[in-house]
């Protein structure tokens, strides 16, 4: 079976009409090409609109009340099995680039325990408080 590449792009507060593939008056040629060659979710909803808790839900597959990330500045448990670890079991190499927002300090290197299971990490934390 062919193993496909998985590229997950997360943007904070990006409305669906900020993508040219859906709203032609917006120019996003690279994102449009990715959406045209991959999967585009036209009706996706978040059950938690806050950055850190949503990322905790996405990575753990559990509601905020169950994964322990109910507000920004909280981290997933070190024992939590996350999406990157499940992908590794299927032979994928996982990497993260950008803002993770799942624990650690915005002013210090991020300890591996906060990498949400990624093998490679080039990221930072961002706290809005």
What are these language model-derived features?
Residues 1-129:
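Formylglycine-dependent sulfatase
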């Amino acid at each position: 079976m062919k193993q496909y590449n998985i590229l997950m792009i997360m943007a904070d507060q990006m409305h669906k009409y900020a993508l040219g593939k859906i709203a032609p008056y917006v120019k996003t040629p690279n994102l449009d090409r990715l959406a045209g060659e991959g999967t585009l979710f036209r009706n996706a909803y978040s059950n938690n609109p806050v950055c850190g808790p949503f990322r905790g839900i996405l990575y753990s597959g559990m509601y905020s009340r169950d994964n322990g990330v109910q507000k920004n500045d909280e981290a997933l448990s070190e024992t939590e099995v996350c999406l990157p670890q499940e992908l590794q079991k299927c032979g994928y190499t996982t990497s993260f680039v950008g803002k993770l927002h799942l624990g650690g300090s915005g002013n210090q290197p991020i300890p591996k325990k906060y990498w949400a299971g990624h093998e490679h990490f080039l990221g930072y934390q961002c706290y809005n408080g």
